Amino acid sequence: MKQKIDKSCGCQIEDILVESPEKSKDKTSVESEQKSDRLCPTSRQDIEIFVDPDVEKISLDFYQKKYTDGLPIIPPTRERLHKFYKYSAYEAQDVLNLLPPRQGKATIEKIAINGVMAGCLPLFMPVLEKAILGLSDPKFNLDGVNATTHPVAICALVNGPITHELEMNTGAGCLGPGNLANATIGRAIRLCLFNIAGAFPGIGDHATMGSPAKYSYFFGENEEESPWEPLHVERGFPKESSAVTVMGMETPHNVNDHRSNTAEDVLDTIVHTISTAGCNNSHVPGELLVIMSPEHAETVDGGGWAKKDVKNYIHENAIVPVELGDRGGRRLDKKWVKNNMVSLTRSPDDVILVVAGGPGRHTTVAHGFGTSCESVTKGLVLKDGSFAGSVKDYLKK
């Protein structure tokens, strides 16, 4: 007999698995002579649901049960999952962390299920694992990021040689569509928040408007065209290693400057774009993301500015009048007020500066979640603690 999921359960289902018809056919609950896939989610009780093996119908069924973002999915069969396990540093039932608000157990199996559903390739698994691991760091405050009415999204950045191995887009259009790794890994992170953390829109995710960045917000740094050290090196990782940084950021905002030919002028355009009322940073200073285009970076570097100089300048000049900062509706800490102006960052370290994108004099900035979320960088390491030189290093024999 088929059992139905209570609609109120929504995204509280923890395990999602589609088995091949042959494996479920001999179960007593399977209708006579019916070939059907088995969706077997487990929360407080075991629930068996039989769905048509047709992929389109499976996608619709998953959507109706709030397992997806509204886009079609790849059915997560055991065969597909085992291909993902081969690229994991862990075993299928190992728990990486607990993801709030539901404190769902992020097992390797569950992460792989969401990776398959999102359309990831198996070799994307090491990056997906590290992104999910970073989200559980207390300073990231995933509970607050998921539950807030603010439209903060999970932005993930990859550094190191793995960006080439996964054929990630670090150049033209890196924040947009058209790249398999960028699109599907970012999507898989969001599906993990749906199905493991329980952060479904209107249930565990209470963003007033939401954000298109909550579909996928994932890219790599264009290290080859950057005049400065990449982010993971800045944070203490070897240049030849690879790393994933997770951040809580708003949707990116364009900075158009085709006329400035000095470092100061380019940076002034950037800080004036950042210095807006109504962002969280204006009343609770914290991190912000500056994705500088190679052409703007070349101009700034050509003026003799080191990366730390740029971060210092943005910290000192990204400010708003105190009366605008107070409009955020929270008590403004006066220690961030100087000469009747509020600093949007607490220190130069709050300025996350990377280089990405292609030709054109456009830079992108994104405000953060204020003091409520701090970015976390995780290196791609193997079980023995050594850095992975390639995703192939993860392959289990």
Language model features with spans:
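Non-transmembrane, aqueous-exposed alpha-helical and coiled segments at domain scale
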Residues: 2-397
